[in-house]
From Swiss-Prot:
Localization, UniProt: Nucleus, Nucleoplasm
A cellular component term, taken from the record's GO annotations: nucleoplasm
Keyword entries, A-Z: Acetylation, Cell cycle, Coiled coil, DNA synthesis, Isopeptide bond, Nucleus, Phosphoprotein, Tumor suppressor, Ubl conjugation
Assembly behavior: Component of the DREAM complex (also named LINC complex) at least composed of E2F4, E2F5, LIN9, LIN37, LIN52, LIN54, MYBL1, MYBL2, RBL1, RBL2, RBBP4, TFDP1 and TFDP2. The complex exists in quiescent cells where it represses cell cycle-dependent genes. It dissociates in S phase when LIN9, LIN37, LIN52 and LIN54 form a subcomplex that binds to MYBL2. Interacts with RB1.
Role according to the record: Acts as a tumor suppressor. Inhibits DNA synthesis. Its ability to inhibit oncogenic transformation is mediated through its association with RB1. Plays a role in the expression of genes required for the G1/S transition.
Designated name of the protein: Protein lin-9 homolog
Tissue: Expressed in thymus and testis.
Length: 542
């Protein structure tokens, strides 16, 4: 009770608060309660007593007490309790508006792309064919002009004044005029034609192609999955597969995946490969060039046709042809600069390939049907097996006929070879001869590296030399670029020569360790140059 009597009454406390707010304390207040504030009592962490704060000077906010009489407390004052900020998790209700907005934007974008003009705008803006991609995605006209006008300018970090000076020196370009558009179209056509010539290896000097990019795209091959543009009724972009390549007209024959579109001939500047396109440095086209036989006139060999040709009589296609009288006549020895017999074999070859393509298509459809039946655990009928076996037997017979015709066509090519600077059929090619000589030198040097021959048996050293020559031939064929059918077939001839010299007990080992691997390499090389048919072993040589 004594302590309660010493406390000020409520009215005096209110006056003190008002005076504190006004910025001054009365002297009576300070004198009356100075004794109570000499030793301030700070509230501890676990105490619940009232806090007795020292009075402050309203002017300078300093402790107004006698430092000599007041005992300084060394304990640190109580810190304000920090309010822990708990991160709020975004609930589904908070992200719902964003999701709805995204869906709304997606619907609007889809509706926009349905418009014909918007669809064409997307095609013009982002669809670039393989032949146009390096032309449009390379350096722009300003960069090209900068390289030509200022070849010694190595930096691109210039000030605004310096860039303005360069633009004034270049002159102001006139764009969006009829003359400008005509000039741009003409330049684009010329660059496309130059790329086609490089793709077909019809140039020997690449100094005239400095305006082209450094990387030239390779031509697309048969079987490539592509996206092509159709015009007319079905105007738009559609996926499909290349079935044929026409280098003369620079077009591709594309069979589209969508039902009802069928097969169309599409120019190469409207066909884009779905797979990453392969490129080749432009400098590589000027290396190891071989003389092109495309523009050479075939020799007019003396040819005397027989009075009656069994091929014409037995072939229904040639038998009904209006050219039969001219072909079988004794007055005509050549037709278009080619012997008639050669043209007949080429016609038969084209016919057999067309029939074989149809059989392969039927076989593919039957394989799909068989896989479907197997997936449903359904039995395969006897009729289905009979039809499948019939197609397989017909394909086997077609392959035999194809080998016969190919052999006859190849024989004519052998006769044509000396006039084109190649070796005839009964002589090894120059590449094979060079590889054999280099292989013998390598084996001889490796065998006598220590001063004494490591292998004294001549048959073994000869076998090692021939096997090394095969490796060198494969290397030359892979680096040659433009594959030659005669040099390609020389690889098979080298294998046959080695196989004929080894012992019969080692033939199985040779087939498993050498021949099968070379066959895989031949398959890959033949796909590069489309020489698989001419490189096949022709067993029917009648």
């Amino acid at each position: 009770m004594a302590e309660l009597d010493q406390l000020p009454d409520e009215s005096s406390s209110a006056k003190a608060l008002v005076s504190l707010k006004e910025g001054s304390l009365s002297n009576t207040w300070n004198e009356k309660y100075s004794s109570l504030q000499k030793t301030p009592v700070w509230k501890g962490r676990n105490t619940s007593s009232a806090v007795e704060m020292p009075f402050r000077n309203s002017k300078r906010s300093r402790l107004f007490s006698d430092e000599d009489d007041r005992q300084i407390n060394t304990r640190s004052p109580k810190r304000n309790q920090r309010v822990a900020m708990v991160p709020q998790k975004f609930t589904a209700t908070m992200s719902t508006p964003d999701k709805k907005a995204s869906q709304k934007i997606g619907f609007r974008l889809r509706n926009l792309l349905k418009l014909p003009k918007a669809h064409k705008w997307c095609i013009y803006e982002w669809f670039y064919s393989n032949i146009d991609k390096p032309l449009f995605e390379g350096d722009n006209d300003f960069c090209v002009c900068l390289k030509e006008s200022f070849p010694n300018l190595k930096t691109r970090k210039l000030t605004r004044v310096e860039w303005g000076k360069i633009r004034r020196l270049m002159g102001k370009p006139r764009r969006c005029s009829s003359a400008f558009f005509e000039e741009e179209r003409s330049a684009l056509k010329q660059k496309r034609q130059k790329i086609r010539l490089l793709q077909q290896r019809k140039v020997a000097d690449v100094s005239q192609f400095k305006d082209l990019p450094d990387e030239i795209p390779l031509p697309l091959v048969i079987g490539t999955k592509v996206t092509a543009r159709l015009r007319g009724v079905h105007d738009g972009l559609f996926t499909g597969q290349i079935d044929a390549v026409d280098t003369l007209n620079a077009t591709y024959r594309v069979t589209f995946d969508r039902t009802g579109l069928g097969t169309h001939t599409i120019p190469d500047y409207e066909v884009l490969s779905n797979e990453p396109h392969e490129t080749m440095p432009i400098a590589a086209f000027g290396q190891k060039q071989r003389p092109s036989r495309f523009f050479m006139t075939p020799p007019r060999l003396h040819y005397t046709p027989p009075l009656q040709s069994p091929i014409i009589d037995n072939d229904p296609l040639l038998g009904q042809s209006p050219w039969r009288s001219k072909i079988s006549g004794s007055d005509t020895e050549t037709l278009g600069g080619f012997p008639v017999e050669f043209l007949i074999q080429v016609t038969r070859l084209s016919k057999i390939l067309m029939i074989k393509k149809e059989h392969i298509k039927k076989l593919r459809e039957m394989n799909t049907e068989a896989e479907k039946l197997k997936s449903y655990s359904m039995p395969i009928s006897i009729e289905f097996q009979r039809r499948y076996a019939t197609i397989v037997l017909e394909l086997e017979q077609l392959n035999k006929d194809l080998n016969k015709v190919l052999h006859k066509v190849q024989q004519y090519c052998y006769e044509l070879a000396p006039d084109q600077g190649l070796q005839p059929a009964d002589q090894p090619t120059d590449m094979r001869r060079r590889c054999e000589e280099e292989a013998q030198e390598i084996v001889r040097h490796a065998n006598s590296s220590t001063g004494q021959p490591c292998v004294e048996n001549e048959n073994l050293t000869d076998l090692i030399s021939r096997l090394t020559a095969i490796l060198l031939q494969i290397k030359c064929l892979a680096e040659g670029g433009d594959l030659n059918s005669f040099e390609f077939k020389s690889l098979t001839d080298s294998l046959n020569d080695i196989k004929s010299t080894i012992d019969a007990s080692n033939i199985s080992c040779f087939q498993n360790n050498v021949e099968i691997h070379v066959a895989h390499i031949q398959s890959g090389l033949s796909q590069m140059g489309n020489l698989h048919a001419f490189a096949a072993n022709n067993t029917n040589r009648d």
